[in-house]
From Swiss-Prot:
Entry-linked Gene3D superfamilies: Hexapeptide repeat proteins (2.160.10.10), MurE/MurF, N-terminal domain (3.40.1390.10)
The organism of origin for this protein: Verminephrobacter eiseniae (strain EF01-2)
Name this polypeptide is given: UDP-3-O-acylglucosamine N-acyltransferase
Catalysis performed (reactions): a UDP-3-O-[(3R)-3-hydroxyacyl]-alpha-D-glucosamine + a (3R)-hydroxyacyl-[ACP] = a UDP-2-N,3-O-bis[(3R)-3-hydroxyacyl]-alpha-D-glucosamine + holo-[ACP] + H(+)
GO cellular component term, pick one: membrane
GO biological process: lipid A biosynthetic process
């Protein structure tokens, strides 16, 4: 089922240039792979060379690229082309694969005290334990578990296999064995949060683990007990956040990175993939803590040198002092 360019512009705004509102769009496609019935996007000026060769019926571009876009055909001018593209994908999904109707699937298991908003959707084999709450317009896909007293805000999307409110990892040592610390807190998830498949968010020990409004979590993420993640932060796949860490608002954490427990990240901190965050970061900025990849022989030599870095530094300082004294 196609959409007309006019329908897209009417729904999303922007300015259609050099094309007809009646042009049918059959799919949304990457710039270099797009065909005559496709809508595409030029998300960054560095891809401008692909623009002239693209066969797309229409391309979403920034106003600064209007002339280059019109030289090849129709375009939609948008101040933020990538955000416009994102909304176009949402519009496409609404027309071609609408969200499930509100309600609770017959195979879901809900404690009698669980509360589900009438506009929420609970998918197959979901479990909502005692006192769990799901807010307006939220969607839980298959096999999501929401533990006792945990709360999901409005318009959230939890993908298959998410577990909210499992016990945090808390044990006290005594005489060579471990004594379990019961996790008496819960999890509070704000509005407009998306949580990827098989991600786990542990309940707090005494206070709640908190995921604030607009946070986006990828697949296979582990969020430890008592963690707090600030508004509109985004964490990529396989990130691990240890207990009691606090991540500010508008932060990003790349795939496979680890944040150690009890650390604090300021607002607007950006962590590169595979970085291990070992100290609190109080200033906004991009941080990387990764030994660069190399062929194995060179890597081993560099690693061996790194182990001796302190002694080499002391030798250089001694040489500098000797030269000054000479």
């Amino acid at each position: 089922m196609s959409l007309l360019l006019g329908q897209i512009v009417d729904a999303l705004g922007g300015s259609l240039q050099g094309g007809s509102r009646d042009t049918p769009i059959c799919r949304i496609a990457p710039l270099q792979a797009a065909g005559p019935g496709d809508l595409s996007v030029l998300s960054h000026p560095r891809y401008q060379q692909q623009l002239a060769a693209s066969r797309a019926a229409c391309v979403i571009v920034a106003p600064a690229l209007r002339a280059a876009a019109l030289a090849r055909g129709a375009c939609i001018l948008a101040e933020q082309p990538y955000a416009y593209f994102a909304r176009a994908t949402q519009l496409w999904r609404q027309h071609h694969a609408p969200a499930p109707a509100p309600g609770v699937h017959a195979s879901a298991v809900l404690d009698p005290t669980a509360q589900v908003h009438p506009t929420a959707s609970i998918g197959p084999l979901c479990i909502l334990e005692r006192g769990a709450q799901v807010g307006a317009g939220s969607r839980l896909q298959a096999r999501v578990t929401v533990g006792a007293d945990c709360r999901i805000g409005a318009r959230c999307l939890l993908h298959a296999g998410v577990v909210v409110g499992a016990d945090g990892f808390g044990f006290a040592p005594e005489d060579g064995q471990w004594i379990k610390i019961e996790q008496l807190g819960a999890v509070r998830i704000g509005d407009d949060v998306e949580i990827g498949a098989n991600t786990c968010i542990d309940r707090g020990t005494l206070q709640d683990t908190v995921i604030e409004d607009g946070v986006k979590l990828d697949n296979l993420i582990q969020i430890g007990h008592n963690v707090r993640i600030g508004k509109h932060s985004a964490l990529a796949g396989c990130v691990g956040v240890a207990g009691s860490a606090r991540i500010g608002a508008h932060c990003t954490i790349g795939g496979g990175a680890i944040v150690l427990g009890h650390l604090e990240l300021a607002d607007h901190v950006h962590i590169s993939a595979a970085t291990v965050v070992t100290r609190s970061l109080t200033r906004p900025g991009q941080y990387t803590g990764l030994f660069p990849i190399d062929d194995n022989a060179r890597w081993e030599k560099n690693a061996a040198t790194l182990k001796q870095l302190h002694s080499l530094r002391e030798r250089i300082k001694a040489l500098e002092q000797a030269l000054k004294a000479a």
